[in-house]
């Protein structure tokens, strides 16, 4: 059974292996052992309530409970921007007009923004290419909503997710090349690495503080504003079906979109409910895929099961109960994995 669980110190080798497969552009998963070890330590301290809210962040891994192999990672930052400033560009409009000359120009413009300060953030979603099957990506992404639903008081009203922008296999970012590089005087990969390893002071020091007309950027850069990396398109679609929307905020490095949603409007959070579990053999049937998660804060587990989403009682085998860290008589959180398609 493949389960989502809290990260542990022993996962460092697995995280390094995953980081080596990202191809760059995933700022929060750098192939740097010291940085990843510090990230694990911060997550463990978050679970033990040893950090202020401004520093808290949860990290989860997707594990095969039989072999112990780790094939994916996902994370939640509790409140961004309360220590280091949280930057986006807001894509807006400036109008230049003259009645005398009969000229009216509405120009797309980038405004430096800290509007998402204090929001909870979904981040560091990466699944090993060999594991991209059997619904693993859905489970990895949406398991965080089960945790947030169970421990709602730990998180803020708005949830954001920065989507990876357009970067080629050589680490070339059209948006960075046309804009960021002119102010930071370094390649995208270098800026990405510095940010991922916590060296963020240079952002505040070198960021352009004034609005930027997008027409001044290359056509290639303009074309990727708000667009995602091809490998990230499925992750974007997953979040949009959960209620997330692009509200014209983009990443300052690669121009990728930032999606956002009020936490209580996220489908999986809103629709999930608690059901009792029993031990036995699950009844056969053609049931839809569902997410199930325990309510154990320190030993959280989530997994994919086939079940009736409307049931009031789930039956699991002894092996499933063990993998989910549950016992008969406990209550688990249940929700349909994907929203039902509306029919006309």
Swiss-Prot record:
Pfam families, A to Z: AstA
Top-rank lineage group of the source organism: Bacteria
Gene Ontology biological process: arginine catabolic process to glutamate; arginine catabolic process to succinate
Record-level Gene Ontology MF annotations: arginine N-succinyltransferase activity
Location of the active site: 229
Pathways per UniProt: Amino-acid degradation; L-arginine degradation via AST pathway; L-glutamate and succinate from L-arginine: step 1/5
Function, as annotated: Catalyzes the transfer of succinyl-CoA to arginine to produce N(2)-succinylarginine.
Binding site for succinyl-CoA: 125
Enzyme class: transferase
EC numbers, comma separated: 2.3.1.109
This protein's record includes keyword Cell membrane: no
Coiled-coil positions: none
Name of this chain's protein: Arginine N-succinyltransferase
Keywords of the record: Acyltransferase, Arginine metabolism, Transferase
Transmembrane segments: none
Reaction(s) catalysed (UniProt annotation): succinyl-CoA + L-arginine = N(2)-succinyl-L-arginine + CoA + H(+)
Family: Belongs to the arginine N-succinyltransferase family.
């Amino acid at each position: 059974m493949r389960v989502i669980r809290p990260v542990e110190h022993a996962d460092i080798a697995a995280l390094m292996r995953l980081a080596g497969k990202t191809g760059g552009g995933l700022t929060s998963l750098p192939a740097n052992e010291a940085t990843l070890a510090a990230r694990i330590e911060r997550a463990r301290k978050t679970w033990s309530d040893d950090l202020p809210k401004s520093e808290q962040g949860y990290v989860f891994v997707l594990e095969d409970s039989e072999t112990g192999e780790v094939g994916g990672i996902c994370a939640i930052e509790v409140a961004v921007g309360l220590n280091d400033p949280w930057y986006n560009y807001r894509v807006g409009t400036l109008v230049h007009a003259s009645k005398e000359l009969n000229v009216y120009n509405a120009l797309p413009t980038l405004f430096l923004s800290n509007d998402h300060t204090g929001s909870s953030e979904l981040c560091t979603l990466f699944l090993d290419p060999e594991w991209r099957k059997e619904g693993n990506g859905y489970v990895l992404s949406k398991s965080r909503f089960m945790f947030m639903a169970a421990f709602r008081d730990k998180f803020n009203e708005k949830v954001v997710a920065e989507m990876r922008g357009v970067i080629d296999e050589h680490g070339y970012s059209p948006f960075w090349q046309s804009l960021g590089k002119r102010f930071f005087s370094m390649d995208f990969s270098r800026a990405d690495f510095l940010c991922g390893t916590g060296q963020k002071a240079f952002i505040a020091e070198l960021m352009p503080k004034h609005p930027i007309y997008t027409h001044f950027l290359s056509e290639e850069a303009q074309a990727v504003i708000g667009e995602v990396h091809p490998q990230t398109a499925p992750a974007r679609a997953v979040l949009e079906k959960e209620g997330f929307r692009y509200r014209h905020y983009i990443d300052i490095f690669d121009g990728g979109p930032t999606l956002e949603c009020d936490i209580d409007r996220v489908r999986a959070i809103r629709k999930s409910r608690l059901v009792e579990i029993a031990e036995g053999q699950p009844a056969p049937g053609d049931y839809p895929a569902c997410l199930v998660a325990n309510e154990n804060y320190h030993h959280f587990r989530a997994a994919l099961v086939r079940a009736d989403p409307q049931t009031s009682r789930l039956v699991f085998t002894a092996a499933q109960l063990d993998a989910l860290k549950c016992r008969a008589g406990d209550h688990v959180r249940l929700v349909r994995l994907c929203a039902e398609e509306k029919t006309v």
